UniProtKB/Swiss-Prot annotation:
It comes from Bacillus subtilis (strain 168). Its cofactor is Zn(2+). The gene is yqgX. Keywords: Hydrolase, Metal-binding, Zinc. Its EC number is 3.-.-.-. This is Probable metallo-hydrolase YqgX.
Length: 211
């Protein structure tokens, strides 16, 4: 199993591809749908689904363009089911003259659980705090977790947007992400990948925090 990061859109949010043979899952198609679709075509991949870590505009900007091209379902946490169609909730309403909206998700995630999509087995980890419906996707077979804007290399997600809460975010990180095996790669919503051990030891936002 392989993965590929593709920074897209004006804020360079990371879209991800999880690839097994000629099939793939797409995570957070935040912009530049033509670029995402072209990569899929060039690699001869068959996408099976789109999984959203959360519904902020920079992670959903190309959602409809990609889903309609490949006719695939979209997964999102139920707490943000109304955000795709509401620019004031997904944050694009703050931008001048740009409102990002998308059609409703096909499948709503309720909390921690498991997803089996084709050859892919994922654990859904409910990790609110950056947003009320943030989900991290743990792929044990690939030793990685796609964390969205919850945890970054040397940083954590912002909590000053709608539904954000710093205490909730820190609890999510410590209870759901830092309890994963230390070698687990953390694929973040912006910037480079990191790993659980590095963030346990070096992340200044997590030092001194205790439950």
């Amino acid at each position: 199993m392989k993965w590929r990061r593709m920074p897209v859109g004006p804020i360079q949010a990371n879209a991800y591809f999880l690839i097994s043979d000629d099939q793939c899952l797409i995570f957070d198609p935040g912009g530049e749908g033509h670029k995402i679709n072209q990569y899929i075509k060039e690699k001869g991949l068959t996408p099976l689904a789109i999984l959203l870590t959360h519904a902020h505009f920079d992670h959903i900007g190309a959602l409809d363009e990609v889903r309609e091209k490949w006719d695939i379902p979209v997964y999102l946490h139920q707490n943000e089911k109304n955000w795709l169609a509401d620019a004031s909730l997904n944050g694009s309403g703050m931008l001048r003259g740009i409102e990002v909206t998308a059609k409703p998700a096909d499948h709503l995630i309720e909390g921690d659980g498991e997803l089996n999509i084709g050859p892919f087995h994922l654990e859904t980890l409910f990790t609110p705090g950056h947003s009320p419906g943030s989900v991290s996707y743990y792929v044990k077979d690939a030793d990685l977790v796609i964390s969205g804007d919850v945890l970054f290399q040397g940083g954590i997600g912002r909590t000053d947007l709608i539904g954000g809460n710093q205490e909730t975010l820190l609890t999510s990180i410590h209870e759901k992400l830092l309890t994963l095996p230390e070698h687990t790669l953390v694929l973040s919503g912006h910037g480079p990948e990191t790993d659980v051990l590095t963030e346990q030891d070096q992340n200044p936002f997590l030092n001194g925090f205790s439950l």
